[in-house]
Amino acid sequence: MAKASYFARRRRDIESVLRRDPAARSALEVVLCYPGYKAVRRHRRAHWLWTHNFKLLARLVSQRTVRKTGIEIHPGAVIGEGLFIDHGDGVVIGETTVIGDNVTLYQGVTLGGTGKDTGKRHPTIGDDVVIGAGAKVLGPFTVGKGSKVGAGSIVLKEVPPNCTVVGNPGRIVRKGSVRCVGPDLDQIHLPDPVKDLSLIHI
């Protein structure tokens, strides 16, 4: 995640929405009407306050954002460029989460911790990852670059790059272009989260 200026990041955040949501018609519409964009923009302010030791003020900004957008991002979370939170209601991103560039999160996603451990306890999400509606990624591990997590999945362990994960608990069903079918999954009923995610826009 290369560091960019505040205005450059805003521009790239807007561009990420326009590029990935066919319902978005203009930059002005994104700025005025998209709660996911608003939450990311406000998080960048809160994160600056957090890293400059204005922690209470950062939390106040964060909580105001929850009330306005329904999206909870802890000000300590590190977020790269081009995060697209589609619809967004119910999204929760924990304090030690790290999110790479050009990540897509759908409504109801939780990037959470496990237990009451201190230190790194939330996931690291690689560049170009897509996480489907209602999915939970819980713990201090990495979801590798280019991977996809199907809607409703619960992921509790490391995901290599360019994999597709579905189910509870999450299981890898595709590595790159190779489909991986476990003993309790068959070819007919195997979910295709990539196809499902492409149809989620309304």
Residue ranges and their predicted role:
Residues 35-36, 41-44, 77, 83, ...:
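Solvent-exposed, flexible loop/coil residues
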Residues 69, 74-75, 80-81, 86-95, ...:
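Left-handed beta-helix
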Residues 78, 163, 172, 186, ...:
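A generic alpha-helix propensity feature with a strong bias for hydrophobic helices
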